[in-house]
Amino acid sequence: MLKIKLTERADSEILVVGLGLIGKKLQIESTGAQIDTAALLTTLTNMGASGEVDEVIKLPSKSNKLIVFTGLGKIESNFSPELLRRAAGAAARHLLGNDSASFALPHKSVAEIAAIAEGAALGSYAFTEFRGSSKGAQKNPLSSITVVTRFANTAQAKTAMKRAEIIAEQTFLVRDLINTPPSSLTPDSFCLRTKKLASKC
């Protein structure tokens, strides 16, 4: 089961931060992350990074195993929850094969960190039940997500993270059912599965 944690400082070898644009100039947007912004911006510029929404770039780092830059597009004074949800989800989808990551995206409210958590969680889905059994064919999604925020010790933030876990768990269930071929998800097996789920309620 996917776990979502809160922290005031990044505690994972993989760090996810935002990358956006002010005019035509790239800018890194993050919270509670200790990174060499100037050097990273030089590298990103030389690589031809755009900072556009849905762009994801992964770079090795001295302080982290990996820094993941997820596009935020044009930088505004406030980022909408939907944009943050989308950015977190895009990054998570590029992290198959890794166990955990810290998401240090910019935010100003609990509603925004809730969106980050939901996006990261929903992006951490992979249906592998009927895939090949070799290691190369089995790339598991993130099993642990940490959201870096100054709201880490607040009750509202903790409630929002629990809600994000529940949303992800139930969404994954529906996706699994949709992705299971009819030859495996017969009416009888579906009934047994729903009874098992109902017994947990």
Kindly label every feature range from the protein language model:
Residues 1-201:
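Short amphipathic alpha-helical segment within the helicase RecA-like ATPase core
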